[in-house]
């Protein structure tokens, strides 16, 4: 099994607010196996790993595994402890979670990714790391291996079955459109007006046809901020072309918007979990600031989305995309 070539003493967690306890210290956890999970409540890849983390907690917490969720925020609003606490409750996370607001733990681990998993053995050494989704079977093998090294001689359960079809053998993960940020700091707005940091800008017309993949266009009155674009009048529109099987958008605060996919309402077999149908039209509805699921399809292909915002004051941060599909 792949492993860290030269095991190193694991760094201690940096001071931070414990969203869910009890607090954990790497030093005082000697004798136990610790899995440190760097995650973010609006990160689609992080959210997709949670079913496995929760299952491992249920399977192995009584046998000496301690999972610690380190929430390192990507956005200013996800540094709010109450936002994180709400996400922890909504996702049903059962293990301790610390808010890494200043990225102290992120820097101590020299981490660069969401999600990232680090396994620490009973002696306090880093033994295994994995970045991104996947390798769930390999990670569970390492959990079992380190528990055995710590003295657990009882039979181990068989590996957890894949929780999604796209995690099973035979699924194909295609190159997809990269995460698309909307704010001026990292965004790629296709508009003759361009970005005007901190200003309200009226975008009068979209360019002919959809924007190239990875770029987007808007119409109506929008406020340009570093992390997000904010609607400033009813009826503002956002236009995106992407290649993906699933499409998500980080939005703040609670609200709703109309979604069209390829010039029509989102078909029933491709609707994300937050899409509802009303009078033959499809809308995304969300009850708190979070990642909103717009499209969820078993098929990977090019998609053209148009979003219409019925109210001002909605902040749109970034699109993320799922890429894995089941061959037909």
Protein language model regions, located:
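Non-globular targeting/processing and membrane-anchoring segments
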Residues: 1-24, 29, 137-328
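Loop/turn elements at helix/coil->beta-strand transitions in domains of secreted/extracellular proteins
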Residues: 30-34, 62-66, 93-95, 122
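Structural microenvironment flanking redox-active thiols in thiol-disulfide oxidoreductases
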Residues: 47-90, 101-105
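Short, internal strand/loop/helix patches
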Residues: 84-120
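Non-catalytic, surface beta->alpha helical segment in thiol-disulfide oxidoreductase systems
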Residues: 111-113, 122-150
């Amino acid at each position: 099994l792949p492993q860290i070539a030269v095991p190193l003493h694991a760094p201690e967690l940096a001071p931070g607010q414990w969203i869910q306890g009890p607090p954990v210290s790497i030093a005082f956890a000697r004798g136990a196996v610790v899995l440190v999970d760097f995650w973010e409540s609006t990160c689609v890849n992080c959210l997709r790993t949670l079913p496995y983390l929760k299952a491992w907690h249920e399977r192995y917490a009584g046998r000496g595994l301690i999972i610690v969720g380190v929430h390192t925020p990507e956005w200013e609003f996800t540094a709010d402890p109450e936002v994180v606490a709400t996400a922890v409750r909504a996702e049903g996370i059962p293990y301790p979670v610390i808010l890494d607001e200043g990225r102290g733990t992120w820097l101590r681990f020299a981490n660069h990714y969401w999600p990232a998993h680090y396994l620490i053995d009973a002696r306090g050494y880093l033994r295994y790391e994995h970045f991104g989704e996947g390798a769930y079977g390999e990670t569970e093998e390492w959990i079992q291996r380190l528990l055995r090294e710590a003295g657990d001689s009882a039979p181990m359960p068989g590996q957890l079955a894949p929780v999604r079809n796209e995690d099973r053998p035979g699924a194909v993960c295609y190159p997809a459109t990269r995460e698309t940020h909307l704010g001026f700091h990292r965004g790629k707005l296709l508009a003759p007006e361009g970005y005007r940091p901190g200003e309200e800008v009226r975008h009068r017309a979209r360019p002919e046809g959809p924007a190239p993949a990875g770029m987007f266009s808007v119409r109506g009155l929008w406020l340009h901020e570093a992390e997000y674009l904010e609607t400033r009048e009813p009826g503002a529109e956002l236009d995106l072309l992407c290649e993906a099987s699933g499409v998500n958008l980080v939005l703040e605060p609670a609200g709703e918007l109309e979604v069209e996919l390829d010039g029509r309402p989102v078909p029933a077999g491709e609707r994300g979990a937050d899409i509802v149908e009303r009078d033959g039209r499809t809308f995304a509805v969300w009850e708190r600031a979070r990642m909103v699921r717009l499209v969820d399809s078993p098929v990977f292909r090019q998609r053209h989305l148009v979003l219409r915002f019925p109210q001002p004051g909605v902040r749109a941060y970034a699109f993320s995309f799922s890429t894995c599909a089941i061959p037909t």
